[in-house]
Design a protein with these regions (language model features):
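Accessory carbohydrate-recognition regions in carbohydrate-active enzymes
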Residues: 21-437, 443-498, 509-532, 538-575, ...
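ATP-dependent phospho-/nucleotidyl transfer catalytic cores
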Residues: 503
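Short aromatic-glycine motifs in intrinsically disordered, low-complexity regions
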Residues: 706-715
Length: 756
């Protein structure tokens, strides 16, 4: 039996073993569809990754449009900042470092590609159409039609493994360091043996920010079989001056066969070439590190070493099974279960670990640090402070604590809390001071095992530093006037005022929890300054000049669909009208009472002013719960939005997943509660979508260990008739974090008609 057939047999036996394992107990990972979000700008990818993995192997198919017509690689085109789009049909390799559900291009580098025949170095020449895709947590496979090559990939947290099923004849494994999603260039590659290369690729400039802080990702790559030929290619830039007369390689790609010294350049790559007499399997193992080549090699050896593909896949899938089993769903609706677990899967990708196997990592100041715990990165905090961290405080408190401690380490290293941090680089993307909100919210939910005094000091620094404040531009005017004007050059002055208010409220909450009464009073008063921007003529928040005059002409609709406008960031006046979650009762009074409040909310939903695909207004469906007798509108609207935007299909997200925030919104809607007010440990109810859900909580933080959520959802009713908590009638549509976590059972009676 040849090696090709033997490998196929091993893979088949492995699949049978996993299938037997699934039949003995219900597996959670079988309900994950990694293709959800790969269309409709969801920016996810179906590649292989471990929970919180630093490395992932994703198919790279963004060099051609859906019709196969050649186009330039437009990384920011229509916000498609992802290595994979479901509609595209032309694959140019498998990238080893990626982001999931973000709105700007970066990473997407260290791209491998199996080919046959003559070696070609241009991805548009060697790329291939593909078919028979399969994806599950920790695994992806595809057939390359051009070459008749089946490819399978799997990954650990810091290393990955690809398996290429080559036909007989000339076959190649390419490693392209020129292609990628990052806006940075530059790479190094060196053969250290006939079967091993090492090198680096520069990345950075996320959202075209912090370009001066571009940094390397190091790698080591090994093939399982020694090639007949190996080498490096380098494409040279084109010169038009006199020197071009003597350059025979001007603008050409130069092949360097058996070259064993380092090659440096912008468009370089390496190849392993074989001449197989029969079909043969070649495995490629890659380890990465942001610290050094030596650490990349150690990560590879420690996490994969001599393990075979099947062992690595099963190890990672066991890790996913453990991660996703925090929630157990009992329902006959298989489709809804797949939507839910796919969301929990996507939410478990970022933030991801940033430290190597030995604990080394790159600090925010560029020095090498060491951690005995876990160092996390990819903090998309403008997005995640609204619902994401509350979910992980509940389901995965140890992970949330490590995230908080990572934020405090960033403060120690850089002098500031993170805003939108990526691989120890502050990108300063979006607005506001969101880390303060996450720190306070985590502490108020009982996760207090971090240095709260340091956190409070860090929070106050960003709120009180008047000069050279990178987190709060315009703070001096904000403190003097109570708002940011359109005259001082701060982006989205209305939106940013609101964000500063929410952060100030969080600081006040933290101050109160720590016993600082005067500071609590000060910050809570400061958090209400958005009222200076409330215009009763429109019942909306409106931009103002520094002299106190309203900005005119004022068009409340301007700014939808990412259109730039004077007052708001990624939204318009309607989408920011209710974004004061800490003062909803006060806003009701400003708007003239409950009837006008509900009327204005209905205006948003009834006239297509609501944007499900972005963060500022995603809590709005739950705001009807603040008005007695109108709670049914929340239940109706959440149900409609779930059905409209969340599907078990590639376009099954409303838009960019924003590192799991949109998935978190869906999960809360299906579970029946939502954290409507960041930095307040409360939830508000809606109708659950499953008959029974068990939340398996960490007993180190939640002694009861389990919460059961029961309902008669399968009978078709979507309106809450009654709620019971531990057998007693519960008369409020709000529940504190403490009461929810101490409950053993929450039961909903649902009906077909609203209870008004």
């Amino acid at each position: 039996m040849n090696q090709f057939k033997l490998t196929l047999l091993v893979a088949l036996l492995s699949s049978l073993a996993i299938g037997q394992q699934k039949s003995s107990h219900q597996s959670v990972i079988e309900y994950v569809n990694p293709f959800i979000g790969t269309s409709n700008y969801g920016a996810t990818n179906p590649g292989a990754i471990a929970p919180r993995g630093m490395l992932s192997i994703s198919p790279f198919n963004v060099a051609f449009d859906a019709s196969g017509r050649e186009i330039p690689l437009e990384k920011d085109s229509q916000w498609l900042s992802t290595p994979y789009v479901h509609e595209n049909e032309f694959l140019t390799g498998f990238t080893h470092v990626n982001l999931s559900g973000v709105g700007c291009p970066d990473l997407g580098v260290i791209i491998s590609m199996p080919t046959t025949g003559e070696i070609k170095t241009n991805h548009l020449d060697y790329g291939s159409a593909y078919e028979n895709e399969k994806a599950e947590p920790g695994y992806y496979s595809v057939d390359l039609k051009k070459y008749g090559i089946k490819t399978e990939v799997t990954a650990t947290q810091r290393a990955g493994m690809s398996r290429f099923y080559f036909p007989a004849g000339t076959s190649n494994v390419l490693l392209n360091l020129g292609l990628g999603l990052t806006n940075e260039q530059g790479a190094m590659l060196k053969f250290v043996s006939p079967t091993e290369v090492e090198g680096l690729r520069m990345v950075g400039s996320f959202c075209y920010n912090s370009e001066e802080k571009a940094y390397p990702v190091y790698f080591v790559a090994k093939v399982s079989k020694e090639p007949q030929r190996r080498g490096i290619w380098k494409k040279h830039q084109f010169y038009e001056g006199l020197e071009a007369q003597w350059m025979g390689y001007n603008g050409e790609t130069r092949m360097k066969e058996n070259f064993s010294r380092a090659v440096v350049g912008d468009s370089i790559g390496g190849y392993f070439s074989y001449n197989f007499k029969q079909p043969t399997v070649v495995e490629l193992k890659v380890g990465i590190s942001y610290v050094s080549i030596e650490n990349a090699r150690e990560n590879l050896e420690k996490e994969i070493g001599e393990k075979n593909f099947t062992q690595v896949k099963m190890m990672t899938q066991r890790a996913w099974e453990k991660q996703l089993s925090a929630v157990e769903i009992e329902s006959d609706d298989e489709n809804k279960k797949k939507i839910f677990y796919s969301g929990l899967y996507h939410a478990s990708i970022h933030p991801n670990i940033f430290h190597d196997f030995n604990g080394d990592y790159v600090k925010s100041n560029g020095e090498i640090g060491h951690t005995e715990g876990e160092r996390y990165t990819v903090f998309s905090l403008w997005d995640t402070y609204r619902n994401y961290h509350q979910l992980f405080s509940l389901l995965y408190p140890k992970q949330q604590m490590q995230m908080v401690n990572s934020m405090l380490s960033i403060y120690d290293e850089s002098g500031w809390l993170p805003k939108w941090e990526l691989n120890s680089t502050e990108t300063f993307t979006m607005v506001g001071d969101p880390a303060a909100i996450v720190l306070a919210d985590t502490y108020l939910r009982g996760l207090t095992q971090f240095d709260a005094e340091k956190a409070f000091t860090a929070m106050k620094k960003s709120a009180e530093t008047l000069e050279d404040n990178p987190l709060r531009p315009g703070i001096k005017e904000y403190l003097e006037k109570g708002y940011l004007s359109v005259d001082r050059g701060v982006s989205g002055p209305v939106s940013t005022t609101q964000e500063y208010n929410i952060a100030d409220f969080a600081i006040g909450q933290m101050a109160e929890a720590l016993g600082y009464a005067e500071e609590a009073k000060k910050y809570k008063k400061q958090s209400l300054s958005y009222r200076n921007l409330f215009d009763k003529e429109f019942n909306l928040l409106r931009p103002k000049h520094a002299n106190g005059n309203w900005y005119s002409p004022f068009d409340p609709d301007k700014g939808a669909n990412f259109e730039k406008n004077v007052g708001y960031i990624e939204g318009n006046a309607w989408q920011y009208a209710f974004m004061v979650p800490h003062d909803m009762r006060g806003l009701i009074q400003l708007m003239g009472g409950e009837k006008k409040f509900v009327k204005q909310l209905n205006e948003i939903f009834n006239n297509q002013k609501f944007d499900m695909a972005n963060e500022p207004d995603i809590a709005y469906p739950y705001l009807f719960n603040y008005v007695k007798g109108e709670e049914w509108r929340t239940q109706k609207k959440v149900d409609e939005l779930l059905q409209k935007y969340y599907k078990n299909k590639p376009d099954g997200l409303p838009g960019n997943d924003d590192t799991g925030v949109m998935s978190a919104w869906m999960m809360y809607g299906m579970l029946g509660f939502y954290p409507v007010a960041p930095a307040q440990p409360i939830y508000t109810f809606t109708s659950p979508k499953f008959d029974k859900v068990t939340l398996n909580l960490d007993t180190d933080f939640h002694p009861n260990g389990k919460i059961e959520i029961l309902s008669n959802a399968s009978e078709g009713g979507k309106y809450i008739q009654q709620i019971w908590v531990d057998g007693k009638v519960y008369k409020s549509y709000f529940i504190t974090d403490r009461v929810l976590k101490n409950a053993r059972q929450i039961r909903f009676e649902l009906g077909e008609n609203p209870k008004k």
